[in-house]
């Protein structure tokens, strides 16, 4: 009944006819069930859209501004939360800097402060020289 066949150097056993029939029947039943289910979902979608579309058209002058308002409110709360977190982070950094705990970036701040102070001193000295020279003449 089951013969050994050779394909590509490998032995392959033919399956009995009853096994093939069961596999085919299972595939047809599963495929048919899924096809029927897909058709029912499509029909329900069409019926739902047909009944809901007039309501969307009637209420769209209310729904569109409501959606925009809700979106803006959500973005506003998100932005305020982000700004709050940023403010807390900055205040924590300032507290650590003032208490001498040397937060990240403190060296850069000190370097920039010293450069700014030296430039301000140079400008002050230059201004004093100019005014003393103008008063002498």
Swiss-Prot record:
InterPro entries in alphabetical order: Oleosin (IPR000136)
Superkingdom of the organism of origin: Eukaryota
A Pfam entry, by short name: Oleosin
Keywords, sorted A to Z: Acetylation, Allergen, Lipid droplet, Membrane, Transmembrane, Transmembrane helix
Stretches assigned to coiled coil: none
GO biological process, one term: sexual reproduction
Subcellular location, record wording: Lipid droplet; Membrane
PANTHER family: OLEOSIN (PTHR33203), OLEOSIN 18.5 KDA (PTHR33203:SF25)
Biological role: May have a structural role to stabilize the lipid body during desiccation of the seed by preventing coalescence of the oil. Probably interacts with both lipid and phospholipid moieties of lipid bodies. May also provide recognition signals for specific lipase anchorage in lipolysis during seedling growth.
Protein name, as recorded: Oleosin Ara h 11.0102
């Amino acid at each position: 009944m089951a013969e050994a066949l050779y394909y590509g150097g490998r032995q392959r056993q033919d399956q009995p006819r009853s096994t093939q029939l069961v596999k085919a029947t299972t595939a047809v039943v599963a495929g048919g069930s899924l096809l029927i289910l897909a058709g029912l979902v499509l029909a329900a979608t069409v019926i739902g859209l047909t009944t809901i579309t007039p309501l969307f058209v009637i209420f769209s002058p209310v729904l569109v501004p409501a959606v925009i308002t809700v979106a803006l409110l959500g973005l506003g709360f998100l932005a305020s939360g982000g700004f709050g977190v940023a403010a807390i982070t900055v205040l924590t950094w300032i507290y650590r800097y003032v208490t001498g705990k040397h937060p990240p970036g403190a060296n850069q701040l000190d370097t920039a402060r010293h450069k700014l102070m030296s430039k301000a001193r140079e400008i002050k000295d230059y201004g004093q020289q100019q005014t003393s020279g103008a008063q002498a003449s």
